[in-house]
């Protein structure tokens, strides 16, 4: 309701996702956290919802106030807009949130880390494979697709530490037909990228944002070195490090 997307309230989200998936289509989920009505429990609610859904690709973003929007004007009137923002989704928001900012950043980072943990990601891929409606096969695989499959088998099925999850998905996909096999391979490749990107880029950037708060620095990216280094106060205490406990 706060986003004025009332069309999303006409049907239960889980029912809508199930209908679309059983029709043979794939749902890609987009979620936003950081609304004024959101409390720290929002992250557990988002996780509980996604655990029940056949949605491999899910992106959660923190609310951002865009110039010229009703949200921007309201926050400006309330004196909550920040003067400096680099537009980085994986940093501090460009306004002062109602939720404790540490709780917002930590909860967001841990939710993203869980979404793209290997076990959770492949579990959603298998859920989609199980529920997806069958699509008639109308063409044979091209040489390019065969080559892509062989490269995927080598990089994900042999070299990757996630190879067991990959082969489990592949075996289940083989039983569902050629088109499902294509889709499973695509999911595996996408997952390999997203799992690494979340671990190597998203989480470290969120940790730096938490360090910024600990250092008592008002949000201004110009106060940081271009190499993405630490705030001037030095290394933060260990309690600021994220520890969601998910399998990486």
Predicted features by range, described:
Residues 124, 136-248:
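Terminal low-complexity segments of carbohydrate-biosynthetic enzymes
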């Amino acid at each position: 309701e706060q986003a004025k997307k009332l069309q999303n309230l006409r049907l239960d989200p889980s029912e809508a996702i199930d209908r679309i998936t059983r029709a043979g289509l794939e749902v890609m989920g987009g979620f936003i956290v950081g609304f004024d009505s959101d409390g720290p429990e929002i992250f557990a609610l988002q996780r509980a919802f996604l655990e029940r859904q056949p949605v491999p690709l899910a992106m959660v973003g923190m609310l951002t106030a865009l110039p010229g929007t009703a949200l921007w004007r309201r926050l400006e009137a309330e004196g909550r807009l920040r003067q400096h923002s680099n537009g980085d989704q994986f940093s501090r928001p460009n306004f002062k949130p109602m939720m404790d900012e540490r709780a917002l950043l930590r909860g967001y980072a841990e939710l993203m880390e869980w979404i793209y943990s290997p076990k959770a990601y492949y579990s959603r891929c298998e859920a989609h494979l199980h529920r997806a409606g069958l699509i008639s096969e109308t063409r044979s695989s091209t040489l390019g697709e065969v080559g892509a499959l062989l490269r995927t088998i080598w990089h994900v099925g042999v070299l990757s530490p996630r190879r067991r999850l990959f082969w489990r998905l592949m075996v289940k996909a083989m039983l569902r037909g050629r088109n499902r096999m294509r889709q499973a391979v695509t999911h595996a490749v996408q997952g390999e990228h997203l799992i690494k990107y979340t671990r190597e880029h998203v989480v470290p950037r969120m940790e730096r944002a938490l360090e910024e708060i600990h250092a008592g620095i008002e949000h201004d990216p110009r106060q940081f070195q271009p190499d993405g280094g630490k705030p001037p106060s030095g290394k933060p205490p260990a309690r600021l490090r994220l520890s969601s406990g998910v399998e990486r």
